[in-house]
Amino acid sequence: MGIQAAEISAILKDQIKNFGQDAEVAEVGQVLSVGDGIARVYGLDKVQAGEMVEFPGGIRGMVLNLETDNVGVVIFGDDRDIKEGDTVKRTGAIVEVPAGKELLGRVVDALGNPIDGKGPLNASERRIADVKAPGIMPRKSVHEPMATGLKSVDAMIPVGRGQRELIIGDRQTGKTAIALDTILNQANYNGREADGMKTLHCIYVAVGQKRSTVAQLVKKLEETGAMAYTTVVAATASDPAPMQYLAPYSATAMGEYFRDNGMDALIIYDDLSKQAVAYRQMSLLLRRPPGREAYPGDVFYLHSRLLERSAKLNEANGAGSLTALPIIETQAGDVSAYIPTNVISITDGQIFLETELFFQGIRPAVNTGLSVSRVGSAAQTKAMKSVAGPVKLELAQYREMAAFAQFGSDLDAATQKLLNRGARLTELMKQPQYSPLTNAEIVIVIYAGTKGYLDGIPVRDVTKWEHGLLQYLRNQKADLLEDMTKNDRKVAGELEDAIKAALDGYAKTYA
């Protein structure tokens, strides 16, 4: 049998042409050392900072340190399953998380994997976790209210959509309670687009908390129906530090989906102190030089680049917004520590909670003197602005006078009146947990307090009086509340007469 040269050359040419098409090109490296959630890897020369890499067994990691001879990788999982000499593969992708309305009602981890046992997410898109914040031109100043349902906050420290308002205080002062009540309060407004109210989608990020605490919170949200418009991102105390560091960024990417598509979202970081601690742990293990309180030099940038992503966009960019309520835990009321001062300077105001007030029974324990909202007054409703003005001033004068009144008993009538009014207003600002009020209810209650309707009521009965008033309004004056909710206007003229009539009507039944 003769060998045909042409046939052989055709086969060879074909094989050369198709050579290597099926071969998978993957850049791999080798683990040099591993421990404490950090792996040192040799051989990943072209890897990007922030890129995902894959270890054997499907464990993922993220590249943080790029050095001359190796790269430092933080591991999103158990480092006990990784050993020296293991192969590490590049994925070519920066850390991404799922985003979209499919995440509402779900509990996910820092990488967006569902942990609530309700099946896969089927999210409509994926977004990079750590992206640049919007520039100056796409933004608009904050002008729409974001109601928390808490009298002391909505009247004196108002928050607007697109604002960053810090909640700061010691442990066990009710920081999470304020955030949770804000989520629950949105049930009064969500789904009412016909009345000109945009739905506020909520994202709650639990960083370094106990699993039992997160489970209780999710249970409360489900019981009240608030889970329908809420996503919970959990990186609990037992999760590795890289997960606690990443969770706020991942959750913000999920919130940006709403912001960039012309919708409104609220994100609660609970809390950023623990994220800073997780980042400090990672940085020290990666041998980055420590700075003040052993935090790395870029810990300010850690929080500033996160919180700058919360913004109100202008009409040309869809008019969406992302509002942030970061929480910071202080030690013994020290707000001059490193992380608290950093976050205070980044945010647009703070709600300051005090242990002393909490134990006096003033809950929410808001110190109205130290709390401030730098942009919120522009976002207050007209009705609230017209009645809430005198409250902060009267309470400030009351606190000042109360300090003097301890020394002398012979007070003139004007001072005595101020003290009596202040004591009743302080009592009026108290509010039980899980019972947020609508804007209209708060306006009427505060109007009653500032116009002297409470002056004849004993201080101990103020809470009872207010509870009765709310019941009366909901049962007898529901149309007034509805009208105030739909048509926001200054409390004057007809509206003021209607409120006075309602209060006079209640006064007769209370007597």
UniProtKB/Swiss-Prot annotation:
Would the keyword Transport turn up in this protein's UniProt record?
yes
Q: Name one GO molecular function term.
A: ATP binding
Q: Which CDD domains match?
A: ATP-synt_F1_alpha_C (cd18113), ATP-synt_F1_alpha_N (cd18116), F1-ATPase_alpha_CD (cd01132)
Q: Does the keyword Translocase apply?
A: yes
Record: residues binding ATP: G169, D170, R171, Q172, T173, G174, K175, T176
Give UniProt keywords alphabetically.
ATP synthesis, ATP-binding, Cell inner membrane, Cell membrane, CF(1), Hydrogen ion transport, Ion transport, Membrane, Nucleotide-binding, Translocase, Transport
List residue numbers at the site (Required for activity): S371
Write out the annotated subcellular location: Cell inner membrane
One cellular component term (GO) for this entry is:
plasma membrane
Q: What class of enzyme is it?
A: translocase
Please report the record's description of how this protein sits within the membrane: Peripheral membrane protein
Question: Where is it mainly found?
Answer: membrane
| Residues passing through the membrane, by range | none
- What Gene3D superfamilies is this protein classified in? 2.40.30.20, ATP synthase alpha/beta chain, C-terminal domain, P-loop containing nucleotide triphosphate hydrolases
Which reactions fall under this protein's catalytic activity? ATP + H2O + 4 H(+)(in) = ADP + phosphate + 5 H(+)(out)
Q: What's the Enzyme Commission number for this chain?
A: 7.1.2.2
Family statement drawn from the similarity comment of this UniProt entry: Belongs to the ATPase alpha/beta chains family.
HAMAP family per the UniProt record, alphabetical? ATP_synth_alpha_bact
Q: What does this protein do?
A: Produces ATP from ADP in the presence of a proton gradient across the membrane. The alpha chain is a regulatory subunit.
State the oligomer form and interacting partners: F-type ATPases have 2 components, CF(1) - the catalytic core - and CF(0) - the membrane proton channel. CF(1) has five subunits: alpha(3), beta(3), gamma(1), delta(1), epsilon(1). CF(0) has three main subunits: a(1), b(2) and c(9-12). The alpha and beta chains form an alternating ring which encloses part of the gamma chain. CF(1) is attached to CF(0) by a central stalk formed by the gamma and epsilon chains, while a peripheral stalk is formed by the delta and b chains.
Protein's recorded name: ATP synthase subunit alpha
Species of the source: Paracoccus denitrificans (strain Pd 1222)
